[in-house]
């Protein structure tokens, strides 16, 4: 019991009138009975306990936790005291300010982009200025004469010839080589153009002249026809007929009021229908003889009509020969 009394010693000495007073040699049963009694847990007994033990000391730097729901109050205090001027709080504020300052506005972004573009332009200008600019070389007449002499001998001079030529013309070997390259390109272009022109002229000489119609017989036809018209009759001369005409197509003198007549064949040809060739010539070539109108020649039509007549006559001769053979 001495152990209990030492461990649980009262901080304030109880009075003798209290129920918990225990003398130096007093029994412990009275104390245990009072603990088992229900009156010990009543308000009166609680007041006695407060009087016996005294009020608990409250620390000033602690704050009692309030049982509040996080959903009801967003500013929940979990027992951490907020002291103004605390170093941790100031460091957090500074970090947040730095994060906000890192967010660039569009205006600042555009300014920086413009600065980057200017830097890029400066870099490009520096690179272009560092490149060597090529200048055109102006050759004199003496230099061109020397170069042309060598070009007439060979289009591809070797290094030795180029060096000798460079010494004579007071040029560099590289410029001489470039001149020969350009001269060869010009020569190839001229050769190609000359071949094209030569091919065109050859084609024109071969095909174009044969296509043109022959006009050497037109003046003779006109003169003969005008002469026949003046005499009152028209005569189909031999110049109007093809050269390979058969004997049946003899020149025929036509009077204004004569009837149509047929060419003479053998008696066995009567079974075929014949075309009045003389009327064909007179109707197609000699028009308006009775009325006395001026005669107008149609060379193209005359040539076609004569060729058609010749073909028909050849066909009839062929059929006649076949019938004679049978």
UniProtKB/Swiss-Prot annotation:
Belongs to the paired homeobox family. The modification Phosphoserine is found at residues 12, 69, 306. Binds DNA as a homodimer; required for transcriptional activation. Interacts (via homeobox domain) with EP300; acetylates ALX1 and stimulates its transcriptional activity. The modification N6-acetyllysine is found at residue 131. The lineage of its organism: Eukaryota, Metazoa, Chordata, Craniata, Vertebrata. A motif (OAR) lies at residues 306-319. Acetylated at Lys-131 by EP300; increases interaction with EP300 and stimulates ALX1 transcriptional activity. Cartilage and cervix tissue. GO terms for molecular function: DNA-binding transcription activator activity, RNA polymerase II-specific; DNA-binding transcription factor activity, RNA polymerase II-specific; RNA polymerase II transcription regulatory region sequence-specific DNA binding; sequence-specific double-stranded DNA binding. The gene is ALX1. InterPro entries: HD, Homeobox_CS, Homeodomain-like_sf, OAR_dom, Paired_Homeobox_TFs. It is linked to Frontonasal dysplasia 3: The term frontonasal dysplasia describes an array of abnormalities affecting the eyes, forehead and nose and linked to midfacial dysraphia. The clinical picture is highly variable. Major findings include true ocular hypertelorism; broadening of the nasal root; median facial cleft affecting the nose and/or upper lip and palate; unilateral or bilateral clefting of the alae nasi; lack of formation of the nasal tip; anterior cranium bifidum occultum; a V-shaped or widow's peak frontal hairline. The OAR motif may negatively regulate DNA-binding and therefore transcriptional activity. It is found in the C-terminal transactivation domain that stimulates transcription. It comes from Homo sapiens (Human). GO terms for cellular component: chromatin; Golgi apparatus; nuclear body; nucleoplasm; nucleus; transcription regulator complex. One of its GO terms (biological process) is mesenchymal cell development. This is ALX homeobox protein 1. It comes from the Eukaryota.
